[in-house]
Structures are given as C-alpha cells and as structure tokens.
Amino acid sequence: MMQRAPQPIACLLGPTASGKTAAALAFAARAPVEIVSVDSALVYREMDIGTAKPSSEERAVAPHHLIDIVDPVDAYSAADFRADALRLVGEIEARGNVPLLVGGTMLYYKALTQGLNDLPAADPEVRATLDADAAREGWPALHARLAAVDAVTAARLAPNDSQRIQRALEVFMLTGQPMSALLAAPARSDDLAKGYRFVPIALEPSDRSVLHARIAQRFDAMLAKGFIDEVRRLRARGDLHPGLPAMRCVGYRQAWEYLDGETDYDTMRDKGVFATRQLCKRQLTWLRAMPERIVVDCCAGDAAGLALQAIERVIAG
C-alpha cells in the first residue's frame, strides 16, 4: 500500500511588525482556517497591549489557539509548544478546517519541525539557588562561572544576560554536561510530526528601515493605549518579578525598569524600541537560515495579498 504523502502545513513566519496578522486574516476571510500562534509572548494572560495580541474583533474572524493559555507567573517551554501545536493541527484537520501557524518565535518553530534536544526541564530549586547567588555576587560573576564549565555558551552571552546564563548553568548543574554539547547532539526524533510537511512562508523586509519605522510607530501606539498601566497592574499582583520569562518579554522589561525608577520615560521608550529592533534582527537571522522558506517582501504595497497567494500555493500542495 502506498504511503500517504505528508500533509503540507503553511507556517506564516516573520519578525515583529512585519504584517503577519493582516496576512493571516486575509486568508481566514477566504478559507475555513484556524490559526495556531507561534509566539512565546502571546501565551500569557493579562499581557495584551505589550504583546500586540490580536484584538477580540480579529480573533472573531477565525479561531485562534495558544493565546492566553498561561499565567505570567508560570513557564511555557518549546517542548510544551511542540506538543500543543501538533495536537491542535490534528484536531483542526479532523474538524475539516485548515491549520495556519502564525508567529515569530523561531525556537518554537525549530522545536516543531526538527524535534527537541535532550535538555532537562527547569528546576525551581536550582533556579532559586542561582538567583540567590546572583543577588549576592552579580550576574557577571555567574557568567564567569559559566565560562569555566561551558566556554562556548558563555562566549555568545552578555555578562548580564541573566535568563540565558541561568539556564546554561542550570543545565550543567542538572546534567553535568555543557549545554553547548547537548545542543550540538542530534535532536530526539519521534513520529508525531511525520505526517506533516511544515512549509515556512517568511515575511522579510526589502528595506529594513521601513520595518524599523513600523517598530517605533507600534511601540508608541502601545504606550498610547496604556501599556505602562498594564505593567502597573501586573506589578500590583505581587507575585511577579523581572526574572520571570513573562516579564523578560520585550517592552515589559523596559517598562518594569521605568516603574522601578531606574530610567526616565523617554529612555524607557527608546530602550523598548531598540530592544524590539534587536529582536527583529534575531528573528531575521533565524529566517534566513531556512533555505526552504518562501520569501514575501513585507515592505511591498500588497504584502498581505502576496502572502495570501503563497499560503494558498502551500495548501494546494
């Protein structure tokens, strides 16, 4: 018996402010689509403005998944995403609808399409120990500690990159092996994704300055919508702190510093825009490492229409 060819699944990927939502909704207007978010910030509840979460009107156009599923105090990993996304794709197809993956968290996409490395799950006790060490010695000291056991990882991290330094030390403490060595090992394979062929459609700028201008405009619009008040409400809960993954999201970290009195308003705004541009740069680096991607110029006048055509070609096989 002939084996069924893998089902093509369109994945609309792109950096911040590249027009992913507009393109996805254009497709949703023409097909029975359900959108699966590929975004590590949209998973968090109570974080709407700073994540540019789709509005209730936009979500009414088509069902959206993996949005508002986690409390900001909790963690959500690439492994969690992979399991959820594969389950959802199967459920959406079983309903007779078309799954469309949309987002910009490239680590999630890599986990989905290439499998997972054999890294341990987060350990609250180890993290608490490292947080205490950092409070006493400072993150540069922990960066030096990391360099002694995993020089490869330490070399690519800034001395104050607390999130990644902590994770790399945590992995070493739990496994006795450098994280760089574990990441270099072949990813664990399974049969869960073998029935699908995930096709990346990349919204990339022909003129990066256009994207930079959009990023600045979007951050200013977030501020005008009440982003600072949103962060104030999160702080008022009392159970959140700047070390949590949710509060390390771009924009939230800068707003938290501002509300702590560490920066003034204009500096916070400029740092937020700069951090978003740096995120965009990293996203584009990931995208350009995908030779199989279909490229759509997000600066084109009809970028949404071009992306729509690409999605329809993928779905048609």
Curated annotation (Swiss-Prot):
EC number: 2.5.1.75
GO molecular function: ATP binding; tRNA dimethylallyltransferase activity
Family, similarity comment: Belongs to the IPP transferase family.
A single GO BP: tRNA modification
Pfam families xrefs: IPPT
Keywords: ATP-binding, Magnesium, Nucleotide-binding, Transferase, tRNA processing
Cited HAMAP family: IPP_trans (MF_00185)
Enzyme class of the recorded protein, top EC level: transferase
Gene3D superfamilies the record matches: 1.10.20.140, P-loop containing nucleotide triphosphate hydrolases
Gene that encodes the chain: miaA
Catalytic activity entry: adenosine(37) in tRNA + dimethylallyl diphosphate = N(6)-dimethylallyladenosine(37) in tRNA + diphosphate
Listed name of the protein: tRNA dimethylallyltransferase
InterPro entries membership: Dimethylallyltransferase, IPT, P-loop_NTPase
Sequence positions that bind ATP: G14, P15, T16, A17, S18, G19, K20, T21
Lineage: Bacteria, Pseudomonadati, Pseudomonadota, Betaproteobacteria, Burkholderiales
Cofactor(s) for this UniProt protein: Mg(2+)
Summary of the function given for this chain in its UniProt record: Catalyzes the transfer of a dimethylallyl group onto the adenine at position 37 in tRNAs that read codons beginning with uridine, leading to the formation of N6-(dimethylallyl)adenosine (i(6)A).
Annotated region (Interaction with substrate tRNA), positions in chain: 39-42, 163-167, 248-253
